[in-house]
Amino acid sequence: MNTYAFNRELRLLTPEHYQNVFQQAHRAGSPHFTIIARNNKLSHPRLGLAVPKKQIKTAVGRNRFKRLARESFRNSQHQLPNKDFVVIAKKSAQDLSNEEIFKLFDKLWQRLSRPSRG
């Protein structure tokens, strides 16, 4: 049975992990946030979050966006390929409803799950 936990092993933890994702990465974006992905050699996907204070001013807004991103990843993790993903928030993300954010995440997860052309 699949577990839907979001354990430590499913997170990007060190600056080196993030730097690896930014090199030779595939991008999928919307006007509200971008997801950057790179293949990993693990048996599961991992998630990292970048929600700058410059983009989303309030801690409440940043925490809300991160909570929704983690929840979307947690629910989709079994359909995702073995890649490292970094979600980068943009200023307009704070204006979306929770439902709109989830729909956008689903669309971008699907786009990044397709086999790459190169």
Curated annotation (Swiss-Prot):
Stored InterPro entries: Ribosomal_Su5_D2-typ_SF (IPR020568), Ribsml_uS5_D2-typ_fold_subgr (IPR014721), RNase_P (IPR000100), RNase_P_CS (IPR020539)
Alphabetic keyword roster: Endonuclease, Hydrolase, Nuclease, RNA-binding, tRNA processing
PANTHER family (UniProt xref): RIBONUCLEASE P PROTEIN COMPONENT
Enzyme class: hydrolase
Alphabetical list of HAMAP family matching this protein: RNase_P (MF_00227)
EC numbers, comma separated: 3.1.26.5
Protein name: Ribonuclease P protein component
Gene Ontology CC: one annotated term: ribonuclease P complex
Family per similarity comment: Belongs to the RnpA family.
Source organism (scientific name): Vibrio parahaemolyticus serotype O3:K6 (strain RIMD 2210633)
